[in-house]
Regions:
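Transmembrane helical segments that form the transport core of multi-pass membrane transport proteins
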Residues: 35, 43, 64, 69-81, ...
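Intrinsically disordered, low-complexity non-transmembrane regions of multi-pass membrane transporters
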Residues: 1-13, 181-228
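Membrane-embedded helical hairpins/re-entrant loop segments and their flanking transmembrane helices
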Residues: 67-99, 118-123, 283
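N-terminal signal-anchor module of multipass membrane proteins
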Residues: 2-6, 10-72
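Hydrophobic core segments of alpha-helical transmembrane domains in multi-pass membrane transport
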Residues: 17-30, 61-68, 146, 164-180, ...
Protein backbone atom coordinates (compact mmCIF):
# COMPACT_ATOMS: atom_id res chain seq x y z
CA UNK A 1 0.00 0.00 0.00
CA UNK A 2 1.13 3.56 -0.63
CA UNK A 3 2.06 5.85 2.26
CA UNK A 4 0.06 9.10 2.72
CA UNK A 5 1.00 12.42 4.34
CA UNK A 6 -1.27 14.64 6.45
CA UNK A 7 -2.94 16.05 3.32
CA UNK A 8 -3.76 12.60 2.00
CA UNK A 9 -1.16 12.74 -0.77
CA UNK A 10 1.06 9.79 -1.55
CA UNK A 11 4.56 10.02 -0.12
CA UNK A 12 5.87 7.14 -2.22
CA UNK A 13 4.16 5.09 -4.93
CA UNK A 14 3.47 1.46 -4.03
CA UNK A 15 5.94 0.21 -6.60
CA UNK A 16 8.81 1.97 -4.84
CA UNK A 17 8.42 -0.21 -1.74
CA UNK A 18 8.43 -3.32 -3.88
CA UNK A 19 11.57 -2.10 -5.64
CA UNK A 20 13.27 -1.36 -2.31
CA UNK A 21 12.48 -4.85 -0.99
CA UNK A 22 13.79 -6.50 -4.15
CA UNK A 23 16.98 -4.41 -4.16
CA UNK A 24 17.65 -5.07 -0.46
CA UNK A 25 16.97 -8.81 -0.77
CA UNK A 26 19.02 -9.51 -3.87
CA UNK A 27 21.59 -6.86 -2.97
CA UNK A 28 22.27 -8.67 0.30
CA UNK A 29 22.48 -12.08 -1.37
CA UNK A 30 24.64 -10.73 -4.19
CA UNK A 31 26.97 -8.95 -1.76
CA UNK A 32 27.55 -12.10 0.31
CA UNK A 33 27.61 -14.70 -2.46
CA UNK A 34 28.58 -12.67 -5.50
CA UNK A 35 25.98 -11.91 -8.16
CA UNK A 36 26.98 -14.69 -10.62
CA UNK A 37 27.12 -17.27 -7.82
CA UNK A 38 23.78 -16.08 -6.42
CA UNK A 39 22.03 -16.42 -9.77
CA UNK A 40 23.62 -19.81 -10.48
CA UNK A 41 22.70 -21.12 -7.02
CA UNK A 42 19.08 -19.98 -7.34
CA UNK A 43 18.66 -21.55 -10.78
CA UNK A 44 20.49 -24.78 -9.94
CA UNK A 45 18.64 -25.21 -6.64
CA UNK A 46 15.29 -24.75 -8.35
CA UNK A 47 16.33 -27.14 -11.13
CA UNK A 48 17.46 -29.80 -8.66
CA UNK A 49 14.25 -29.39 -6.66
CA UNK A 50 12.24 -29.89 -9.84
CA UNK A 51 14.07 -33.05 -10.87
CA UNK A 52 14.68 -34.70 -7.50
CA UNK A 53 11.87 -33.37 -5.30
CA UNK A 54 8.88 -32.33 -7.40
CA UNK A 55 8.90 -35.39 -9.64
CA UNK A 56 9.39 -37.55 -6.56
CA UNK A 57 6.36 -35.89 -4.96
CA UNK A 58 4.43 -36.31 -8.19
CA UNK A 59 5.16 -40.03 -8.22
CA UNK A 60 3.89 -40.21 -4.64
CA UNK A 61 0.74 -38.35 -5.65
CA UNK A 62 0.15 -40.73 -8.57
CA UNK A 63 0.61 -43.89 -6.49
CA UNK A 64 -1.37 -42.68 -3.49
CA UNK A 65 -4.05 -41.25 -5.74
CA UNK A 66 -4.46 -44.65 -7.37
CA UNK A 67 -4.49 -46.46 -4.02
CA UNK A 68 -6.91 -43.97 -2.53
CA UNK A 69 -9.33 -44.33 -5.45
CA UNK A 70 -9.15 -48.12 -5.15
CA UNK A 71 -9.91 -47.91 -1.42
CA UNK A 72 -12.87 -45.65 -2.13
CA UNK A 73 -14.14 -47.84 -4.97
CA UNK A 74 -14.14 -51.04 -2.93
CA UNK A 75 -15.56 -49.64 0.31
CA UNK A 76 -12.50 -49.39 2.57
CA UNK A 77 -13.06 -45.67 3.14
CA UNK A 78 -16.64 -46.22 4.31
CA UNK A 79 -15.41 -49.01 6.61
CA UNK A 80 -12.77 -46.74 8.15
CA UNK A 81 -15.37 -44.04 8.67
CA UNK A 82 -17.57 -46.37 10.70
CA UNK A 83 -14.71 -47.97 12.64
CA UNK A 84 -12.67 -44.88 13.55
CA UNK A 85 -15.33 -42.20 13.94
CA UNK A 86 -15.33 -42.61 17.78
CA UNK A 87 -11.55 -42.00 17.85
CA UNK A 88 -11.01 -39.32 15.20
CA UNK A 89 -13.98 -37.17 16.17
CA UNK A 90 -13.12 -36.35 19.80
CA UNK A 91 -9.37 -36.02 19.20
CA UNK A 92 -9.07 -34.28 15.83
CA UNK A 93 -12.67 -33.20 15.19
CA UNK A 94 -12.44 -35.02 11.85
CA UNK A 95 -14.37 -37.93 10.32
CA UNK A 96 -12.99 -41.46 10.59
CA UNK A 97 -11.89 -41.59 6.94
CA UNK A 98 -9.15 -39.09 7.78
CA UNK A 99 -7.11 -41.93 9.26
CA UNK A 100 -6.51 -43.17 5.72
CA UNK A 101 -4.82 -39.85 4.96
CA UNK A 102 -2.58 -40.25 8.00
CA UNK A 103 -1.48 -43.69 6.80
CA UNK A 104 -0.84 -42.42 3.26
CA UNK A 105 1.28 -39.45 4.33
CA UNK A 106 3.13 -41.50 6.98
CA UNK A 107 4.18 -43.98 4.31
CA UNK A 108 4.98 -41.31 1.71
CA UNK A 109 4.87 -37.51 1.91
CA UNK A 110 2.59 -34.52 2.55
CA UNK A 111 0.90 -34.19 -0.87
CA UNK A 112 -0.53 -37.72 -0.56
CA UNK A 113 -3.40 -36.25 1.47
CA UNK A 114 -4.33 -34.01 -1.48
CA UNK A 115 -4.67 -36.99 -3.82
CA UNK A 116 -7.28 -38.36 -1.42
CA UNK A 117 -8.95 -35.00 -0.89
CA UNK A 118 -9.51 -34.60 -4.63
CA UNK A 119 -11.74 -37.67 -4.57
CA UNK A 120 -15.32 -36.40 -4.20
CA UNK A 121 -16.51 -39.46 -2.31
CA UNK A 122 -13.71 -39.09 0.23
CA UNK A 123 -14.36 -35.34 0.56
CA UNK A 124 -18.10 -35.89 1.02
CA UNK A 125 -17.52 -36.89 4.67
CA UNK A 126 -16.19 -33.42 5.58
CA UNK A 127 -17.53 -29.99 6.38
CA UNK A 128 -15.57 -27.23 4.69
CA UNK A 129 -13.61 -26.19 7.77
CA UNK A 130 -12.61 -29.80 8.39
CA UNK A 131 -11.68 -30.29 4.75
CA UNK A 132 -9.34 -27.29 4.79
CA UNK A 133 -7.61 -28.56 7.95
CA UNK A 134 -6.68 -31.76 6.09
CA UNK A 135 -3.54 -29.97 4.88
CA UNK A 136 -2.33 -29.53 8.45
CA UNK A 137 -3.43 -33.01 9.53
CA UNK A 138 -1.70 -34.81 6.66
CA UNK A 139 1.49 -32.78 6.87
CA UNK A 140 1.97 -33.74 10.53
CA UNK A 141 2.56 -37.37 9.48
CA UNK A 142 4.50 -36.66 6.28
CA UNK A 143 7.49 -38.94 5.66
CA UNK A 144 7.00 -40.38 9.15
CA UNK A 145 8.16 -43.87 8.24
CA UNK A 146 11.30 -42.54 6.55
CA UNK A 147 12.17 -40.36 9.56
CA UNK A 148 11.69 -43.16 12.11
CA UNK A 149 13.58 -45.75 10.05
CA UNK A 150 16.44 -43.30 9.50
CA UNK A 151 16.70 -42.53 13.21
CA UNK A 152 16.67 -46.26 14.02
CA UNK A 153 19.46 -46.81 11.49
CA UNK A 154 21.59 -44.38 13.51
CA UNK A 155 21.23 -46.60 16.59
CA UNK A 156 18.28 -44.89 18.32
CA UNK A 157 15.15 -46.98 18.89
CA UNK A 158 13.05 -45.65 21.79
CA UNK A 159 13.61 -41.94 21.12
CA UNK A 160 11.99 -41.99 17.63
CA UNK A 161 8.87 -43.65 19.05
CA UNK A 162 8.64 -40.92 21.69
CA UNK A 163 9.05 -38.43 18.87
CA UNK A 164 6.15 -40.10 17.03
CA UNK A 165 3.92 -39.51 20.07
CA UNK A 166 5.08 -35.90 20.13
CA UNK A 167 4.18 -35.52 16.44
CA UNK A 168 0.67 -36.83 17.17
CA UNK A 169 0.26 -34.21 19.90
CA UNK A 170 1.49 -31.51 17.54
CA UNK A 171 -0.93 -32.76 14.90
CA UNK A 172 -3.89 -32.35 17.27
CA UNK A 173 -2.75 -28.81 18.08
CA UNK A 174 -2.16 -27.82 14.45
CA UNK A 175 -5.38 -29.35 13.11
CA UNK A 176 -7.68 -27.91 15.76
CA UNK A 177 -5.96 -24.52 15.65
CA UNK A 178 -6.43 -24.39 11.88
CA UNK A 179 -10.10 -25.28 12.26
CA UNK A 180 -10.46 -22.47 14.79
CA UNK A 181 -8.77 -20.00 12.42
CA UNK A 182 -11.02 -21.03 9.52
CA UNK A 183 -14.24 -20.80 11.54
CA UNK A 184 -13.25 -17.39 12.87
CA UNK A 185 -12.67 -16.10 9.33
CA UNK A 186 -15.56 -17.99 7.68
CA UNK A 187 -18.23 -19.01 10.24
CA UNK A 188 -20.45 -20.34 7.46
CA UNK A 189 -17.93 -23.13 6.77
CA UNK A 190 -19.10 -24.85 9.97
CA UNK A 191 -22.26 -26.05 8.21
CA UNK A 192 -21.25 -26.04 4.54
CA UNK A 193 -20.28 -29.40 3.07
CA UNK A 194 -16.91 -29.71 1.33
CA UNK A 195 -18.67 -31.23 -1.69
CA UNK A 196 -21.98 -30.03 -3.10
CA UNK A 197 -24.95 -32.45 -3.27
CA UNK A 198 -24.84 -32.26 -7.07
CA UNK A 199 -21.23 -33.45 -7.16
CA UNK A 200 -22.04 -36.27 -4.74
CA UNK A 201 -25.00 -37.30 -6.90
CA UNK A 202 -22.75 -37.44 -9.97
CA UNK A 203 -20.24 -39.60 -8.10
CA UNK A 204 -23.01 -41.93 -6.92
CA UNK A 205 -24.31 -42.30 -10.47
CA UNK A 206 -20.81 -43.16 -11.67
CA UNK A 207 -20.46 -45.58 -8.76
CA UNK A 208 -23.72 -47.33 -9.67
CA UNK A 209 -22.52 -47.68 -13.26
CA UNK A 210 -19.14 -48.97 -12.10
CA UNK A 211 -20.75 -51.64 -9.94
CA UNK A 212 -22.24 -53.15 -13.09
CA UNK A 213 -18.73 -53.70 -14.46
CA UNK A 214 -16.40 -56.56 -13.60
CA UNK A 215 -14.06 -56.33 -10.63
CA UNK A 216 -11.03 -56.18 -12.93
CA UNK A 217 -12.42 -53.24 -14.92
CA UNK A 218 -13.40 -51.40 -11.73
CA UNK A 219 -9.90 -51.93 -10.34
CA UNK A 220 -8.26 -50.77 -13.56
CA UNK A 221 -10.47 -47.69 -13.92
CA UNK A 222 -10.03 -46.62 -10.31
CA UNK A 223 -6.23 -46.94 -10.48
CA UNK A 224 -5.98 -44.99 -13.73
CA UNK A 225 -8.41 -42.26 -12.65
CA UNK A 226 -6.69 -41.91 -9.28
CA UNK A 227 -3.27 -41.80 -10.91
CA UNK A 228 -4.45 -39.13 -13.34
CA UNK A 229 -5.64 -36.95 -10.47
CA UNK A 230 -2.23 -37.47 -8.86
CA UNK A 231 -0.52 -36.05 -11.94
CA UNK A 232 -2.71 -32.94 -11.72
CA UNK A 233 -1.82 -32.49 -8.06
CA UNK A 234 1.86 -32.99 -8.83
CA UNK A 235 1.76 -30.27 -11.48
CA UNK A 236 -0.10 -27.88 -9.19
CA UNK A 237 2.55 -28.07 -6.44
CA UNK A 238 5.47 -27.14 -8.74
CA UNK A 239 5.34 -23.32 -8.23
CA UNK A 240 5.05 -23.53 -4.45
CA UNK A 241 7.83 -26.07 -4.02
CA UNK A 242 10.30 -24.34 -6.32
CA UNK A 243 9.73 -20.80 -5.09
CA UNK A 244 9.30 -21.38 -1.36
CA UNK A 245 11.92 -24.13 -0.99
CA UNK A 246 14.55 -22.20 -2.92
CA UNK A 247 14.03 -19.16 -0.69
CA UNK A 248 14.16 -21.20 2.52
CA UNK A 249 17.26 -23.12 1.49
CA UNK A 250 19.26 -20.13 0.30
CA UNK A 251 18.71 -18.52 3.72
CA UNK A 252 19.42 -21.76 5.62
CA UNK A 253 22.43 -23.42 4.01
CA UNK A 254 25.94 -22.00 3.93
CA UNK A 255 28.95 -21.85 1.60
CA UNK A 256 31.32 -24.70 0.76
CA UNK A 257 33.57 -26.19 3.46
CA UNK A 258 36.35 -23.77 2.57
CA UNK A 259 33.97 -20.82 3.01
CA UNK A 260 33.74 -19.92 -0.67
CA UNK A 261 30.80 -19.80 -3.06
CA UNK A 262 30.92 -21.64 -6.36
CA UNK A 263 27.35 -21.22 -7.60
CA UNK A 264 26.31 -24.84 -7.06
CA UNK A 265 22.89 -25.85 -5.76
CA UNK A 266 22.01 -25.60 -2.05
CA UNK A 267 24.54 -22.97 -1.09
CA UNK A 268 23.32 -19.97 0.87
CA UNK A 269 23.97 -17.23 3.38
CA UNK A 270 23.00 -19.08 6.61
CA UNK A 271 20.89 -16.16 7.78
CA UNK A 272 18.26 -18.26 9.56
CA UNK A 273 20.77 -20.31 11.62
CA UNK A 274 22.61 -17.09 12.49
CA UNK A 275 19.41 -15.54 13.81
CA UNK A 276 18.54 -18.73 15.70
CA UNK A 277 21.95 -18.82 17.37
CA UNK A 278 21.21 -15.41 18.88
CA UNK A 279 18.42 -16.99 20.92
CA UNK A 280 19.86 -20.48 21.38
CA UNK A 281 19.01 -20.32 25.12
CA UNK A 282 15.33 -20.44 24.11
CA UNK A 283 15.89 -23.67 22.20
CA UNK A 284 17.77 -25.16 25.14
CA UNK A 285 14.87 -24.34 27.46
CA UNK A 286 12.14 -25.53 25.08
CA UNK A 287 13.79 -28.52 23.42
CA UNK A 288 16.68 -29.45 25.70
CA UNK A 289 19.33 -28.70 23.05
CA UNK A 290 22.82 -28.47 24.53
CA UNK A 291 24.56 -27.26 21.38
CA UNK A 292 23.49 -24.34 19.16
CA UNK A 293 24.31 -26.29 16.00
CA UNK A 294 21.29 -28.52 16.65
CA UNK A 295 19.03 -25.59 15.79
CA UNK A 296 19.90 -26.24 12.14
CA UNK A 297 17.67 -29.35 12.09
CA UNK A 298 14.30 -27.71 12.82
CA UNK A 299 15.16 -24.73 10.63
CA UNK A 300 16.00 -27.02 7.71
CA UNK A 301 12.91 -29.16 8.40
CA UNK A 302 10.80 -26.10 7.65
CA UNK A 303 11.78 -26.45 4.01
CA UNK A 304 12.70 -30.13 3.55
CA UNK A 305 12.83 -32.88 6.16
CA UNK A 306 14.96 -35.03 3.85
CA UNK A 307 17.63 -32.33 3.85
CA UNK A 308 17.44 -32.04 7.64
CA UNK A 309 17.97 -35.79 8.06
CA UNK A 310 21.25 -35.48 6.19
CA UNK A 311 22.54 -33.36 9.09
CA UNK A 312 22.20 -36.18 11.65
CA UNK A 313 25.39 -38.18 10.82
CA UNK A 314 27.47 -35.02 11.16
CA UNK A 315 25.86 -34.17 14.49
CA UNK A 316 26.64 -37.68 15.75
CA UNK A 317 30.24 -37.49 14.51
CA UNK A 318 30.78 -34.24 16.43
CA UNK A 319 29.15 -35.65 19.59
CA UNK A 320 26.43 -33.00 19.64
CA UNK A 321 23.47 -35.36 19.72
CA UNK A 322 21.73 -37.48 22.36
CA UNK A 323 18.46 -39.37 22.79
CA UNK A 324 16.54 -36.23 23.69
CA UNK A 325 17.65 -34.52 20.49
CA UNK A 326 16.59 -37.55 18.43
CA UNK A 327 13.13 -37.54 20.04
CA UNK A 328 12.74 -33.82 19.37
CA UNK A 329 14.08 -34.15 15.81
CA UNK A 330 11.65 -36.98 15.07
CA UNK A 331 8.68 -35.03 16.43
CA UNK A 332 9.45 -31.74 14.74
CA UNK A 333 10.74 -33.39 11.56
CA UNK A 334 7.53 -35.39 11.12
CA UNK A 335 5.21 -32.57 12.15
CA UNK A 336 6.81 -29.85 10.04
CA UNK A 337 8.16 -32.13 7.29
CA UNK A 338 9.02 -29.26 5.00
CA UNK A 339 5.61 -27.62 5.28
CA UNK A 340 6.86 -24.22 4.08
CA UNK A 341 7.63 -25.77 0.71
CA UNK A 342 4.35 -27.69 0.33
CA UNK A 343 1.62 -25.89 2.31
CA UNK A 344 1.13 -23.13 -0.25
CA UNK A 345 0.89 -25.57 -3.12
CA UNK A 346 -1.37 -27.97 -1.23
CA UNK A 347 -3.90 -25.31 -0.22
CA UNK A 348 -3.72 -23.85 -3.71
CA UNK A 349 -4.63 -27.22 -5.21
CA UNK A 350 -7.59 -27.48 -2.79
CA UNK A 351 -8.77 -24.03 -3.85
CA UNK A 352 -8.13 -22.16 -0.58
CA UNK A 353 -4.95 -20.23 -1.31
CA UNK A 354 -6.07 -17.23 0.79
CA UNK A 355 -5.95 -19.37 3.94
CA UNK A 356 -2.26 -20.25 3.50
CA UNK A 357 -0.97 -17.78 6.16
CA UNK A 358 -3.38 -19.22 8.74
CA UNK A 359 -2.37 -22.79 7.87
CA UNK A 360 1.34 -21.96 8.12
CA UNK A 361 0.85 -20.20 11.47
CA UNK A 362 -1.16 -23.10 12.91
CA UNK A 363 1.34 -25.69 11.72
CA UNK A 364 4.35 -23.74 12.92
CA UNK A 365 2.80 -23.68 16.40
CA UNK A 366 1.90 -27.37 16.12
CA UNK A 367 5.51 -28.28 15.32
CA UNK A 368 6.78 -26.37 18.35
CA UNK A 369 4.21 -28.13 20.55
CA UNK A 370 5.32 -31.50 19.11
CA UNK A 371 8.98 -30.77 19.90
CA UNK A 372 8.28 -29.54 23.44
CA UNK A 373 6.04 -32.55 24.12
CA UNK A 374 8.73 -34.95 22.85
CA UNK A 375 11.37 -33.25 25.00
CA UNK A 376 9.37 -33.60 28.21
CA UNK A 377 8.16 -37.11 27.42
CA UNK A 378 11.77 -38.19 26.88
CA UNK A 379 12.73 -36.48 30.14
CA UNK A 380 10.01 -38.43 31.98
CA UNK A 381 11.13 -41.63 30.23
CA UNK A 382 14.70 -41.17 31.47
CA UNK A 383 13.37 -40.74 35.02
CA UNK A 384 11.49 -44.06 35.03
CA UNK A 385 13.75 -46.11 32.72
Amino acid sequence: MAKFNMNGKKLLPSGVWCLICVVVLFGYLGFVMGVPNMLNTIMKTAHDLLLNTVFYLMSICVITGALGRVFVEFGLVALLQRALRPLMGPIFNLPGVTSLGAVMTFLSDNPAIISLANDKRFASYFKKYQFISLTNFGTAFGMGLLVIVFMASQGFYVAPLIGLLGACIGCVCSTRLMQRFVLKAYPEYAVEDAVSPEEIAEEEEEEDENHKKTVFIRLLNSMLDGGRSGVEVGLSIIPGVLIISTCVMIFTFGPAEDGTYSGIAYQGVELLPWLANKIDFVFEWLFGFHDPHLVAFPITALGAVGASLSLIPGFIAHGWIDGNAIAVFTAIGMCWSGFLSTHTAMLDSLGYRDLTPKAITAHFIGGLVAAVAAHWMFFLFTLVA
